[in-house]
Amino acid sequence: MESGQPARRIAMAPLLEYERQLVLELLDTDGLVVCARGLGADRLLYHFLQLHCHPACLVLVLNTQPAEEEYFINQLKIEGVEHLPRRVTNEITSNSRYEVYTQGGVIFATSRILVVDFLTDRIPSDLITGILVYRAHRIIESCQEAFILRLFRQKNKRGFIKAFTDNAVAFDTGFCHVERVMRNLFVRKLYLWPRFHVAVNSFLEQHKPEVVEIHVSMTPTMLAIQTAILDILNACLKELKCHNPSLEVEDLSLENAIGKPFDKTIRHYLDPLWHQLGAKTKSLVQDLKILRTLLQYLSQYDCVTFLNLLESLRATEKAFGQNSGWLFLDSSTSMFINARARVYHLPDAKMSKKEKISEKMEIKEGEETKKELVLESNPKWEALTEVLKEIEAENKESEALGGPGQVLICASDDRTCSQLRDYITLGAEAFLLRLYRKTFEKDSKAEEVWMKFRKEDSSKRIRKSHKRPKDPQNKERASTKERTLKKKKRKLTLTQMVGKPEELEEEGDVEEGYRREISSSPESCPEEIKHEEFDVNLSSDAAFGILKEPLTIIHPLLGCSDPYALTRVLHEVEPRYVVLYDAELTFVRQLEIYRASRPGKPLRVYFLIYGGSTEEQRYLTALRKEKEAFEKLIREKASMVVPEEREGRDETNLDLVRGTASADVSTDTRKAGGQEQNGTQQSIVVDMREFRSELPSLIHRRGIDIEPVTLEVGDYILTPEMCVERKSISDLIGSLNNGRLYSQCISMSRYYKRPVLLIEFDPSKPFSLTSRGALFQEISSNDISSKLTLLTLHFPRLRILWCPSPHATAELFEELKQSKPQPDAATALAITADSETLPESEKYNPGPQDFLLKMPGVNAKNCRSLMHHVKNIAELAALSQDELTSILGNAANAKQLYDFIHTSFAEVVSKGKGKK
């Protein structure tokens, strides 16, 4: 990974012992594999891809992302596989897709394309060897992937279906979730492989990496801020429960509020009644989100960034007049005081009286107050420094291991990686000062005081902060001593260090390093930061003088556009030392597999975590939730009753039966004594773009054939006369605002006798187009209800259907089609917005026809007769009033039209003045 040299391409490691066992079981019997996060669901999928990369096979892969597909193809290319998987996208024309399928091998295709190809028999269903499903926890009944699997099983009884997922927690929601997923997958077997599985645990224990847990203590001000935020969170949760007694109390606990999925949990409960909630409840939900962000910023970033966020929150509240109640709590005051105390110190303020301090700070914020900068360093930074120094010391004596080891530092996101890079290259003081200048440029006097103070006190503080005991017996005593922080001192506390004690640093070296840190110019650090990889060669940094030979890479754990970027770095660099600056469960497991796949090669993992913090609690909660999810799955598996016909390899599986005819349906006995009639097969013409929704799947399930074509007018053609335009609520509002719906209604009304607007809404997310107030307040040009009313007035033949779900829509379509002729796909395809091929449009131009309909006395009933008698507007103007009466069949309408055409503008103006 040195500059100028291309990255080494390393093939994926061979399967581990327990993975081989699972593959053998899965080869024997199809099933759903649920493994723990990070334990290699992607490795299992890759192995099955490798097995079927042959022209004699045809294997479809569902639910993969483009980045994952590219990664798998590249890995197979490195392995030397000749018949590589191919990707079927919109770039491949529909006519050439059949040839791609018949060439065999592994096919990555989007769900929409596969659905269309199955329905049009463009894919040879009987030749498909099997289907591999990734992220199987997402396979619900109405999704596209379930539709594909159902079509596959209806046409192919021999092919295999194997599904993989590493998200056990997803099965924890709903009733019998895993059983419903297995039903949609048409599999009978459930394979559970948690981390505590006997085979997994025993194998990984034999090859476990050396782990050094470093529990970093937060500074007193950080602890005070964390306590204040937790108090405010607790108060907000109590108030939320008070305003909404129906909410589940267990899920709204403080422990869950700290975890990552809390936002989804609370929205899950509140979405069905969101439009009914008061402003207070909505404000509380927003406050909870902000407070969770504050907790993350506290442990993740520096003191300046945290204070900047706090001050911006308060400024926003003042600017927009919003009233967040938590800002006026005592805990909020404590949080602001301690956040400011981490950045600067006001000499005149007395810490004994909190209220006076806050008042003084508020008053003096706008004045030229002489502040003494404190710029408290992040304790994890100093812990990272200690780790890097230890690695340097070991690398000096690493000849037995084949030379110095590479170092990989992993942090949560790009921003943290950027800060770590700046900290390593500039040093804490220079980096924080530069950040302070960017954020608070006005306080130039505070910088001068701080620089003077730091130069006087620098050597004494740095010596003490880096001091380590010489013998191991004094380690506990030294740690205890380090926990007590005095005024003006910011020290690192290592409460647990499983490693060799380092030798005492030379005082002169530290002083020299510190001076060089401060003298580093902020401009010397490049501003542009790579988002996916940060390469930092620490040998050029005079502040530390460590890692002269090996390369140090700082990489984000989350947020990369390539999900396998970190995996690539891990296998290409092959680091001997990995520093986990932030705890992330998936990557911890990935490191275990990485170590187990390289037996004999050392790997040391430094685990940096704030002891007793919300960060630690989040990590432990994630572990506990996954363990509980697997325990629940084990209990469900033990009591699960799986029918023999579940796999659908014969005709006895009822899930493969189409149609909804039941025994209690009334029969018309007037027709041949009630004998069963062989009616025509129902069909609906569906626009290609509609296959992104679940409605086509449900229509097909009801026994109605689907003909997918690209329609320009309408989304669904139910009969030769009935055209349906489907809109969701958000789409409806957007189409009404930009005028697109008006144009669509014009086209539908022109070419179909029964144009229909279908408005489909989600039952779990109710909505209200009108408020609870009086109706007259809603009548306006901007109101949705008013626009819908105008639309119906403009198009009298337009019918509006309201459906609470796609299931209800499918049932409604079936009822609308009863005893009606079937639509013709070729005719529907020929209709375009400018089409003139229909019988009604062969004689008349749409433009003049619309113009004619806007004239007084002309309506939809007499318009056709009028156009039949006159060729153009000029002929119409030449007709007398009697002739118009005979054509229109109504004297009043004829008089209105005649007066409109022949009355001059001057006469109209004079009549208007006369009325006044």
UniProtKB/Swiss-Prot annotation:
It is found in: Nucleus; Chromosome. It comes from the Eukaryota. GO terms for molecular function: damaged DNA binding; DNA endonuclease activity; identical protein binding; promoter-specific chromatin binding; single-stranded DNA binding; single-stranded DNA endodeoxyribonuclease activity; TFIID-class transcription factor complex binding. Residues 658-813 are annotated as: Nuclease. Its EC number is 3.1.-.-. Heterodimer composed of ERCC1 and ERCC4/XPF. Interacts with SLX4/BTBD12; this interaction is direct and links the ERCC1-ERCC4/XPF complex to SLX4, which may coordinate the action of the structure-specific endonuclease during DNA repair. Acetylation at Lys-911 by KAT5 promotes interaction with ERCC1 by disrupting a salt bridge between Glu-907 and Lys-911, thereby exposing a second binding site for ERCC1. Deacetylated by SIRT1. Its cofactor is Mg(2+). Belongs to the XPF family. There is a cross-link at K500 (Glycyl lysine isopeptide (Lys-Gly) (interchain with G-Cter in SUMO2)). This is DNA repair endonuclease XPF. Residues 683-763 form the ERCC4 domain. The gene is ERCC4. It is linked to Xeroderma pigmentosum complementation group F: An autosomal recessive pigmentary skin disorder characterized by solar hypersensitivity of the skin, high predisposition for developing cancers on areas exposed to sunlight and, in some cases, neurological abnormalities. The skin develops marked freckling and other pigmentation abnormalities. XP-F patients show a mild phenotype. XFE progeroid syndrome: A syndrome characterized by aged bird-like facies, lack of subcutaneous fat, dwarfism, cachexia and microcephaly. Additional features include sun-sensitivity from birth, learning disabilities, hearing loss, and visual impairment. Its main location: nucleus. Residues 1-457 are annotated as: Helicase-like. InterPro entries: ERCC4_domain, Restrct_endonuc-II-like, RuvA_2-like, XPF, XPF_nuclease. A motif (Nuclear localization signal) lies at residues 486-491. It comes from Homo sapiens (Human). Residues 460-487, 502-526, 660-679 are annotated as: Disordered.
